[in-house]
Amino acid sequence: MKVSLFITCLSDVFFPEVGKSVVEIMNQCGVELDFPEGQTCCGQPAYNSGYQEDAKLAAKQMIKAFEHSEYIVTPSGSCASMVHHYYKEMFKGDSEWYEKAVHLADRTYELTDFLVNVLGKNNWKSKLVEKAVFHQSCHMSRALGIKEEPLKLLSQVEGLDIKELPYCQDCCGFGGTFAVKMSSISETMVDEKIKHIEATEANLLIGADMGCLMNIGGRLRRKNKNIQVLHVAEVLAKGLSK
């Protein structure tokens, strides 16, 4: 099986360890992994800001970059949902690019979705002794319907005690450009999220979208909270049996 890694902007610039963890995970699974160098931003920031033509340019570049990929895996529910839902929306009036967008979406998977529903992983060999909570990101859980897959994988990590996070379905307040345009509302939302995390007495927050982790993690640091933040890929790669 051949898999192409769609790294995303946030992993490339802010969370390189997440990308490295995905590589370790795929190696453990015996998957042949490549990295198409022509990939770029998926176009979501431009699309959400109303710059349709700029978003289309980014989408076309992504479609070209992954044209020959068998499977495309990304450690981001947000970017995966952009490819799955909004590429087709952008190219509705262009039959050629619409078909290409559909073809790309059909081969694109969020990481935990791929591990559980394509590779059928049910006995993950990693270890991390921590008390943790899992944050359900909006795009991943609502747009893609991926809720149980990350929890199923995390339940297989030796030593990891996952506590139930109150109001886990609530947005953390990031929302891409929302956090910039409506910063005061965003701050209130992330403070509420932190309050619920603290109520569990967990010392580790796990998530599957780096935008959420950047937002919550940044707020935790600003408030001097001693709670570690990790992407699910980093957790799955911890103490991985070689």
UniProtKB/Swiss-Prot annotation:
It comes from the Bacteria. Disulfide bonds: none annotated. InterPro entries: Cys_rich_dom, LutA. One of its GO terms (biological process) is lactate metabolic process. GO terms for molecular function: oxidoreductase activity. Pfam families: CCG (PF02754). GO terms for cellular component: cytosol. Belongs to the LutA/YkgE family. Is involved in L-lactate degradation and allows cells to grow with lactate as the sole carbon source. This is Lactate utilization protein A 2. The gene is lutA2.
